[in-house]
Amino acid sequence: MMKPWENISYFGNQKIISQLDTLYENDKLNSTLLFNGSYGLGKATLAFRYSNYILNQKTEKFTSFSIKNNTITNMIKKNVHPDLIYISNNDQDNSNHEIKIDQIRTLKTKLISKTLNGTNRIVIIDPLESLNKSSFNSLLKV
């Protein structure tokens, strides 16, 4: 199964993609976005795609954005881009677990550092429901 950050093609959610463009054009895009829905709808894929768009410094509308084969995209595919922090409930062996407070503490440490090229810093937590009570409370204090 393809990981969300590896997926170059994206189909669906065109209404959401258009809304993201409209919010950005009207300078009303919040610093936090929450994608909600059933498993398998493409929420994480959309989040990684929008992250790629933002980190590539938005040279076009998101509705017409196509993922380019460049350094930023390759870093995202390898999950090593310093300005994109991905917190998941999957271990190396793909077993699900809760997201623990240590992961959120590590996130806080990473958020203190400067961004690469002065771009935005993006955090994707997938799924948010996997935060335990302590990690959720810690996240609220970021």
PLM features per residue range, with description:
Residues 2-134:
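Clamp-loader machinery-focused feature within the broader ASCE/P-loop NTPase space
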Residues 112, 137-142:
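Conserved catalytic/switch belt of AAA+ P-loop NTPases
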